[in-house]
C-alpha cells in the first residue's frame, strides 16, 4: 500500500498509539514494521491473531513481560566464539523466564476453560522451546550484577582469600587511624581507596611520619593519600588475587556462553514468539482504548461500518456514523456544508480499512464487514506545493492523474472536494467525468463535493448513492451526522433568515433561482425530514427489540429457576418417601429373619415365596432418584420355555417352565415356582454346564448361640472359634456367647484378641454376672 496514503490518513499516529503499549524493543520493532497486508488469508490471520490475545487480555490479567529484551545479537556473538557478560546472560535468562511464565499461564487458562479455543495462540505456545537447563545454569551461577562466590570451587577460594586479606588490611589500617598519637596527623580518621589500594588521608606536613606510597592528594594539596608500608604487600597480594579472580570469571562466563550457543536456535525461536506476543498484546491494549471490535472479512466487495468513528479524535465528543456501501453501490457522493465533517468521514473510512488490514481491531460497533483492498488511494486536503509553484487545483489534479493510472477494481479511492479550485461549471463537469472513469475501472469510490450538479449525478447513474452531513439551522452549526441516501441541500436562505436578513430580500432571492433548483432543494428537504423520521423510528425499534430481548432473557431465567425448584421439590418428596419405605423394608427384613430362625429352630410352617412377595410390595413403592436409577431390562430374543432369565423385581435368577400367554410365564426360582409378567423377565445367556463332582457332606445341624472352649488347647480353641463364627454368621445370629472359663486368663485374652481382628465381629464385651461373668465373652456379629 502506498506510503503517501498512509501519511495522509495519519497511520503513523495509530502506530504510535500501539508503540506506547509495547514493553520491549522486540515489540516496538514489530510495531515499526507494521503495514497493511493485501492478501486475504494474511489479513484474516492477522485479525484472528489479534482477536485471540484481545479476548484473553479483556478477561484475564496477563503475566508481566517486563525485562523482555532483544537478545539475538548476544546469541550470534556467543555462536561465533565471543564471551557474554553477566548482564547479557541475565537478559537471556529473563527471556526464558518470561516465556515460561506465559506458557504456564496459558496452560492453566486452557485447563480452566476447556470450551474456549485459541488455535493461533496455541500454535505459538507449542513453538516455545524447553530451556529449563540453560535457565538453571545461568540462575545458579550469577545474580543481576556478578557471579556468585560458589559459581566454582576455584572462585570461592579466591574470593575467600581476598576477603580475609582485606580484613587484615582493614585491621592494620584501623589501628593506625585509631591511634591517639596519629589523630592530629590525619585529615580524617577513615580508611579509603585510591587506585584500588587501601590508603589513609594524611596531612601534608606529617608526611615524614608515615612510611608508605603516596597514591593521590587532595585538590588543595593539604591531604595526601598514603598506603602504609605495613599493608603494601597485602595490597599486592589482593591485586594478584583480583587477577586470578578475573581469569576464573572469564572461564565461567565462557562456559555459560557455550551453553547459550548450544541452544541458539531455541533461543531465537523464543525471542521471535515472545516479541510477537508483546506486539499482539500492545495491539490488544490499543484496541481496548479505542473500544475496537473485530470485523468480518468477505471475499466479495463489502463495506459496512456501524457507528464508526475516527480513532484519533476525542472519544467523548466525536460523532459516530454508520458508513455503508449498500448492495450494488460502488460510489458514494457526500455533500454538505464546509467544516461539516465530510473530510473526517473520508479519513475515517480510509484509516479503518488500513487498520483492519494491519490486524488492528477497529472503532465500530460489533458486526462490521469489510473486503480486502489491494490499495487505498487518497486525494484529501490541500497538498499545494510552494516549491513546485502549483496551485491548489493543479496539486489535486496531479495527484488524481497518478491515482487514475494505478487504481483498479481492488482499490478504494477517496476524493475530497473533487473538482474544487477552478471554475464551478468546469470543475463539476470534470468531477463527473472522473467519477465515470473510476466507476468504469471498477474501484470503490467515496467523494465529497459542494457542487450542486453532483447531487443529481446519482439519479442518472446506477451504483451511485448520495449522502450528506447534517446542518442544524437552529444552532447554525453542523451536527456531523452522516445521512446515507440523502443529498445535501443549500441552507443559505434559512441561515440568512436566522441571522436577521430582511424577508423581502430573501423572498426576492428565491425568485431569482431556477425552478428546477428550487424543486430539488424542496425535495432534499423532504428527504431529510423523512430520513429523520425513519431514523427516529429505527432507534425506537432498536430500543424495543433490546427491551424484548431483556424480558425474554429474564423470563427464561425465571422459568429455569422454576423448573429447578419444581424438580427439587419432587426429589425431596421422593427422598422422604424412600426413607419411610426403607425403614419399613428394614423392619420387614428383621421380621423375615426372625421367622426364618423360628422355622429352622422349631419347624414353623412359613412359606418362602410369601415372605419374598410381601417384601416386594414395599420395594414397588420406591421412587427412582434419577433416570440412571431406573432399571430397564435389555431387549433380547423372544423368551421361550427353557430360557434362563433374571427376575428384575426380585433380582433373582430363574428358569422359564411355561409361557402362559403373551404377558405371563411360569418361572422356577430355586424351590419357588411363580407366575410372573414377561416384562419383568430379562433373558440371560445360558452358561455352559460344567461337569460336577459328587461331594458327600454331613447334614448341617442347627448350631447353638454359645460355644464352650473349656478344656481346649490354645491353638485348637482358636480354630474351633473360627469355624463357629462362620456358622453363626450363616445362621444370621446377631450375638453369640464364647465360654472360655476363668483359669489363668490366657484363653480369655486370646479369644478377645481374635475377636478384635475377625471380619465378622463388630463388637464384643465381657459377660454379665447373669451370663457367666469373666468366664464368658459376648460377641456381636455384623
Swiss-Prot record:
Root EC class: hydrolase
Do you know which PROSITE patterns this protein is assigned to?
DNA_MISMATCH_REPAIR_2, SMR
**Which key words are in the record?**
ATP-binding, DNA-binding, Endonuclease, Hydrolase, Nuclease, Nucleotide-binding, RNA-binding, rRNA-binding
* Record-linked SMART domains: MUTSac, MUTSd, SMR
Q: Where are the transmembrane segments?
A: none
Q: Where does ATP bind?
A: 336-343
Q: Summarize subunit and interaction data from the UniProt record for this chain.
A: Homodimer. Binds to stalled ribosomes, contacting rRNA.
Q: What does this protein do?
A: Endonuclease that is involved in the suppression of homologous recombination and thus may have a key role in the control of bacterial genetic diversity. Acts as a ribosome collision sensor, splitting the ribosome into its 2 subunits. Detects stalled/collided 70S ribosomes which it binds and splits by an ATP-hydrolysis driven conformational change. Acts upstream of the ribosome quality control system (RQC), a ribosome-associated complex that mediates the extraction of incompletely synthesized nascent chains from stalled ribosomes and their subsequent degradation. Probably generates substrates for RQC.
Q: Which family does it belong to?
A: Belongs to the DNA mismatch repair MutS family. MutS2 subfamily.
What's the protein here called? Endonuclease MutS2
Organism whose genome encodes this protein: Staphylococcus aureus (strain MRSA252)
The upper taxonomy is:
Bacteria, Bacillati, Bacillota, Bacilli, Bacillales
Gene this protein is translated from: mutS2
Amino acid at each position: 500500500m502506498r506510503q503517501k496514503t498512509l501519511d495522509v490518513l495519519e497511520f503513523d499516529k495509530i502506530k504510535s498509539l500501539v508503540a506506547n503499549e509495547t514493553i520491549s524493543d522486540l515489540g516496538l520493532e514489530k510495531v515499526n514494521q507494521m503495514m497493511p497486508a493485501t492478501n486475504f488469508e494474511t489479513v484474516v490471520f492477522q485479525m484472528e491473531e489479534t482477536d485471540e490475545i484481545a479476548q484473553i487480555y479483556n478477561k484475564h490479567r496477563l503475566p508481566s513481560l517486563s525485562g523482555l529484551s532483544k537478545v539475538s545479537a548476544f546469541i550470534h556473538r556467543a555462536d561465533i566464539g565471543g564471551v557474554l557478560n553477566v548482564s547479557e546472560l541475565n537478559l537471556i535468562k529473563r527471556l526464558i523466564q518470561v516465556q515460561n511464565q506465559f506458557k504456564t499461564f496459558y496452560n492453566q487458562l486452557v485447563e480452566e476453560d476447556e470450551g474456549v479455543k485459541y488455535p493461533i495462540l496455541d500454535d505459538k505456545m507449542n513453538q516455545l522451546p524447553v530451556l529449563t537447563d540453560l535457565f538453571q545454569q545461568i540462575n545458579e551461577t550469577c545474580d543481576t550484577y556478578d557471579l556468585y562466590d560458589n559459581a566454582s570451587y576455584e572462585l570461592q577460594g579466591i574470593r575467600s582469600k581476598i576477603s580475609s586479606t582485606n580484613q587484615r588490611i582493614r585491621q592494620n589500617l584501623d589501628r593506625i587511624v585509631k591511634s591517639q598519637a596519629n589523630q592530629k596527623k590525619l585529615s580524617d580518621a577513615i580508611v579509603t581507596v585510591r587506585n584500588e589500594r587501601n590508603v589513609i588521608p594524611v596531612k601534608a606536613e606529617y608526611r615524614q611520619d608515615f612510611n608508605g606510597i603516596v597514591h593521590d592528594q587532595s585538590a588543595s594539596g593539604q591531604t595526601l593519600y598514603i598506603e602504609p608500608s605495613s599493608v603494601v604487600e597485602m595490597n599486592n597480594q589482593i591485586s594478584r588475587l583480583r587477577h586470578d579472580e578475573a581469569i576464573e570469571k572469564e572461564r565461567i562466563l565462557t562456559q555459560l556462553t557455550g551453553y547459550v550457543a548450544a541452544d541458539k536456535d531455541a533461543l531465537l525461536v523464543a525471542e521471535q514468539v515472545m516479541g510477537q506476543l508483546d506486539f499482539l498484546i500492545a495491539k490488544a491494549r490499543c484496541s481496548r482504548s479505542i473500544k475496537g471490535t473485530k470485523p468480518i472479512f468477505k471475499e466479495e466487495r463489502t463495506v459496512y461500518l456501524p457507528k464508526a468513528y475516527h480513532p484519533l479524535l476525542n472519544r467523548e465528543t466525536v460523532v459516530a456514523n454508520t458508513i455503508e456501501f449498500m448492495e450494488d453501490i460502488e460510489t458514494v457522493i457526500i455533500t454538505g456544508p464546509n467544516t461539516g465533517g465530510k473530510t473526517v468521514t473520508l479519513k475515517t473510512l480510509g484509516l479503518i480499512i488500513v487498520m483492519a488490514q494491519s490486524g488492528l481491531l477497529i472503532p465500530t460497533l460489533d458486526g462490521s464487514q469489510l473486503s480486502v483492498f489491494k490499495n487505498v488511494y487518497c486525494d484529501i486536503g490541500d497538498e499545494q506545493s510552494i516549491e513546485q509553484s502549483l496551485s491548489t487545483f493543479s496539486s489535486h489534479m496531479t495527484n488524481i492523474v497518478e491515482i487514475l493510472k494505478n487504481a483498479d477494481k481492488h482499490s478504494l479511492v477517496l476524493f475530497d472536494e473533487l473538482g474544487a479550485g477552478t471554475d464551478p461549471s468546469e470543475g463539476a463537469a470534470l468531477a463527473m467525468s472522473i467519477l465515470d472513469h473510476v466507476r468504469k475501472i471498477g474501484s470503490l469510490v467515496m467523494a465529497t463535493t459542494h457542487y450542486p450538479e453532483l447531487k443529481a449525478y446519482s439519479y442518472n447513474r446506477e451504483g451511485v448513492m448520495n449522502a450528506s452531513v447534517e446542518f442544524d439551522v437552529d444552532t447554525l452549526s453542523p451536527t456531523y451526522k452522516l445521512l446515507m441516501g440523502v443529498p445535501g441541500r443549500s441552507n443559505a436562505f434559512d441561515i440568512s433568515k436566522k441571522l436577521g436578513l430582511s424577508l423581502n430580500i430573501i423572498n426576492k432571492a428565491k425568485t431569482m433561482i431556477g425552478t428546477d433548483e428550487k424543486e430539488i432543494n424542496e425535495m432534499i428537504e423532504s428527504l431529510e425530514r423523512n430520513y429523520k423520521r425513519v431514523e427516529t423510528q429505527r432507534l425506537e425499534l432498536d430500543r424495543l427489540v433490546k427491551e424484548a430481548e431483556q424480558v425474554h432473557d429474564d423470563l427464561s431465567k425465571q422459568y429455569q429457576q422454576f423448573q429447578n425448584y419444581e424438580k427439587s421439590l419432587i426429589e425431596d418428596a421422593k427422598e422422604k418417601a424412600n426413607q419411610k419405605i426403607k425403614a419399613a423394608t428394614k423392619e420387614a427384613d428383621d421380621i423375615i429373619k426372625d421367622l426364618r430362625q423360628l422355622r429352622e429352630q422349631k419347624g414353623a410352617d412359613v412359606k418362602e415365596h410369601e415372605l419374598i412377595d410381601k417384601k416386594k410390595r414395599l420395594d414397588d413403592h420406591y421412587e427412582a432418584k434419577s433416570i440412571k436409577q431406573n432399571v430397564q431390562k435389555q431387549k433380547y430374543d423372544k423368551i421361550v420355555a427353557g430360557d434362563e432369565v433374571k427376575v428384575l423385581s426380585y433380582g433373582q435368577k430363574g428358569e422359564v417352565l411355561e409361557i402362559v400367554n403373551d404377558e405371563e410365564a411360569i418361572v422356577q426360582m430355586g424351590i419357588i415356582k411363580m407366575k410372573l409378567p414377561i416384562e419383568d423377565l430379562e433373558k440371560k445367556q445360558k452358561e455352559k454346564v460344567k461337569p460336577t463332582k459328587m461331594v458327600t457332606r454331613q447334614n448341617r445341624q442347627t448350631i447353638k448361640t454359645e460355644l464352650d472352649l473349656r478344656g481346649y488347647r490354645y491353638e485348637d480353641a482358636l480354630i474351633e472359634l473360627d469355624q463357629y463364627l462362620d456358622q453363626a454368621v450363616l445362621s444370621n445370629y446377631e450375638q453369640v456367647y464364647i465360654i472360655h472359663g476363668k483359669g489363668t486368663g490366657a484363653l480369655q485374652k486370646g479369644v478377645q484378641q481374635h475377636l478384635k481382628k475377625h471380619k465378622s465381629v463388630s463388637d464384643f464385651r465381657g459377660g454379665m454376672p447373669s451370663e457367666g461373668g469373666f468366664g464368658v465373652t459376648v460377641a456381636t456379629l455384623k
